[in-house]
Swiss-Prot record:
Keywords attached to this entry: Chaperone, Cytoplasm, Nickel
Subcellular location, principal: cytoplasm
Family indicated by similarity: Belongs to the UreE family.
GO biological process: protein folding
Naturally occurring in which organism (per UniProt): Pseudarthrobacter chlorophenolicus (strain ATCC 700700 / DSM 12829 / CIP 107037 / JCM 12360 / KCTC 9906 / NCIMB 13794 / A6)
Keyword Cytoplasm: yes
Function noted in UniProt: Involved in urease metallocenter assembly. Binds nickel. Probably functions as a nickel donor during metallocenter assembly.
Protein name, entry field: Urease accessory protein UreE
Protein's cellular compartments: Cytoplasm
UniProt-listed InterPro entries: UreE, UreE_N, UreE_N_sf
Chain ranges passing through the membrane: none
Protein encoded by which gene: ureE
């Protein structure tokens, strides 16, 4: 089976639309975050069925909860594996600036969340790296190591010096 478009996302559906999918069996395509950026790939569902994913250019990244296929009593949904991350919570704007500058020099991929997010504080989230953890420990910057399903995958930012 070739999947060429995402039909919707379970997390974004209004309650009345979600009811249409309630009785369906959910077959999952479990992907690590790094695979979400690939438009063309092969994947195997948790039932052992192989599928091909061939999304159009510009279709955006896959996300946790994306509905790939619906038929009769079954649906195929993307399930994203948690990513090992460092959740960094600087105490002051100065500490944030110094930390962001130091980590930015490493070309570290990061995501930023505000206090209204699931983190409950303004934080910077980056993929786990032991050298970053060592820097944060020595600099005294508050952080925690967590397993998280991120809303969007880390993506390399193109640049030149």
């Amino acid at each position: 089976m070739i999947i060429d478009k995402v039909l919707g996302n379970l997390h974004d559906l209004p309650e009345n639309d979600l009811a249409a999918y309630t009785g369906l069996h959910r077959e999952k395509v479990v992907l690590p975050s790094a695979q979400l950026v690939k438009r063309i790939q092969r994947a195997t569902t948790d039932h052992g069925n192989e599928i091909g994913i061939r999304l159009a250019s510009g279709s955006g990244d896959l996300r946790d909860g994306d509905i790939l296929h619906v038929a009769d009593t079954n649906m195929i949904v993307v399930s994203v594996l948690p990513t090992d991350v460092l959740v960094i919570a600087p105490r002051t704007i100065h500490e944030m600036g110094v930390t962001a500058h130091s980590l930015g020099n490493r070309h570290l991929q990061a995501q930023f969340f505000d206090a209204d997010s699931e983190y409950g504080a303004a934080v910077m989230v980056c993929a786990y790296d032991h050298t970053v953890e060592d820097y944060l420990t020595h600099a005294g910057v508050p952080y925690t190591r967590q397993e998280r399903v991120l809303p969007v995958p880390f993506r390399h930012a193109e640049h030149s010096h």
